[in-house]
């Protein structure tokens, strides 16, 4: 349920209504726009008489929200959310960003790759220090040492870092190392203890869609994080598992405009994991930009044939240079704000 207040509603009136609702045992989510203020009611709304709420002087109207996701719902928050990722980088609304770097942090080559992707125009650095792998015998990541290398690259280049967290017990480690953006990978999209734990922080969370997850399940995963108090969620479409075997996954670009319609949260697209092959990354990156994504996450490695993981889908730095030039050209046409 949402209460849409009149434009004349004062701060005191808003506080009074919020207090009245919370005394009924519900939580509230207040969204202030240019022309209206919306109070979202979260919890058992059967405790609230909508006609009584609507009779209050400053309430314009009351509307029920049928979707199970509330805080992530655009009806609760009509204006696009803009997430501050640190180092002066924001994503959402008219802010378009490119996240780039290797699949795995491998060692000193990280800084070489980071310098190249920044020079090409990437604004955020990705790299996995902890790797969820299908096989227990595959490379699992460098762990804390990998986080240290990411932090060193971030400090040198003044770039926010995006790296995956897999275990609720590691949240404090990520906080201590001041990781800018914690990524929840596809395999952990319904790891509810992890979602709740990162929700207790204020660190931005890049939440990937599960391999077989529906759009509603992605939004409900975001709801888990936001229900704990962390509204800094970035959604990521990274491809879903279908009957098609010619690509690693099927890139569901329908999800980008659908998510924008349903939610105020920023939407990033990952053409690397979606396709699984270098040759398809650029065309799908351009398509994702054209259909309204707020950003891209692209894997780049200076020697893909020697990469410790996912080399088949990594662009070389030279390929990334070319791709960024084309992304810029698309962005000049469709993005509200031109890339730097």
Enumerate the predicted regions with their spans.
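N-terminal small/glycine-rich loop or linker at the start of catalytic domains
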Residues: 83-105, 133-136, 260-269
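Catalytic beta/alpha-barrel core
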Residues: 6, 142, 158-167, 171, ...
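Active-site mouth loops of central-metabolism enzymes
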Residues: 96-112, 136-140, 160-164, 185-186, ...
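Catalytic alpha/beta core domains of metabolic enzymes, predominantly
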Residues: 91, 201-300
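Glycine-rich, proline-tolerant flexible connector loops at the mouths of alpha/beta enzymes
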Residues: 126-144, 302-312
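N-terminal amphipathic alpha-helix/helix-capping segment at the start of soluble metabolic enzymes
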Residues: 67-100, 325, 332-340
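Alpha-helix-loop-beta-strand connector modules within alpha/beta enzyme cores
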Residues: 139-163, 197-204, 253-268, 313-336
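Hydrophobic faces of well-ordered beta-strands that scaffold small-molecule active sites
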Residues: 96-102, 123-127, 161-163, 180-184, ...
């Amino acid at each position: 349920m949402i209460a849409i207040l009149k434009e004349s509603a004062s701060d005191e009136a808003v506080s009074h209504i919020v207090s009245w609702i919370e005394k009924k045992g519900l939580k509230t989510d207040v969204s202030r726009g240019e022309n209206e203020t919306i109070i979202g009611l979260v919890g058992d709304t059967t405790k609230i008489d909508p006609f009584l709420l609507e009779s209050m002087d400053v309430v314009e109207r009351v509307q029920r929200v049928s979707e199970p996701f509330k805080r992530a719902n655009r009806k609760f928050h009509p204006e696009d959310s803009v997430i501050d990722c640190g180092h002066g980088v924001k994503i959402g609304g008219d802010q378009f960003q490119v996240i780039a770097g290797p699949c795995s942090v491998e060692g000193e080559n990280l800084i070489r790759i980071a310098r190249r992707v920044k020079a090409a125009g990437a604004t955020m650095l990705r790299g996995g220090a902890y790797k969820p792998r299908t096989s227990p015998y595959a490379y699992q990541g460098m762990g804390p040492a990998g986080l240290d290398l990411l932090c060193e690259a971030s400090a040198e280049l003044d770039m926010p870092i995006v790296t995956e967290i897999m275990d609720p017990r590691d949240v404090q480690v990520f906080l201590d190392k001041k990781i800018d953006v914690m990524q929840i990978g596809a395999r952990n999209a319904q790891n509810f203890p992890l979602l709740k734990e990162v929700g207790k922080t204020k660190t931005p969370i890049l939440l990937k869609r599960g391999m077989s997850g529906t759009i509603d399940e992605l939004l409900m995963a975001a709801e888990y994080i936001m229900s704990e108090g962390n509204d800094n969620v970035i959604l990521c479409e990274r491809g879903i598992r279908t009957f098609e075997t010619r690509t690693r996954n099927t890139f569901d670009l329908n999800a980008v405009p659908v998510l924008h319609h349903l939610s105020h949260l920023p939407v990033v697209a990952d053409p690397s994991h979606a396709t699984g092959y270098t040759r398809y990354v650029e065309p799908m990156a351009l398509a994702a930009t054209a259909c309204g994504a707020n950003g891209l996450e692209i894997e780049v490695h200076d020697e893909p044939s020697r990469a410790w993981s996912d080399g088949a889908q990594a662009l070389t730095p030279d390929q990334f240079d070319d791709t960024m030039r084309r992304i810029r050209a698309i962005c000049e046409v469709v993005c509200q704000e031109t890339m730097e």
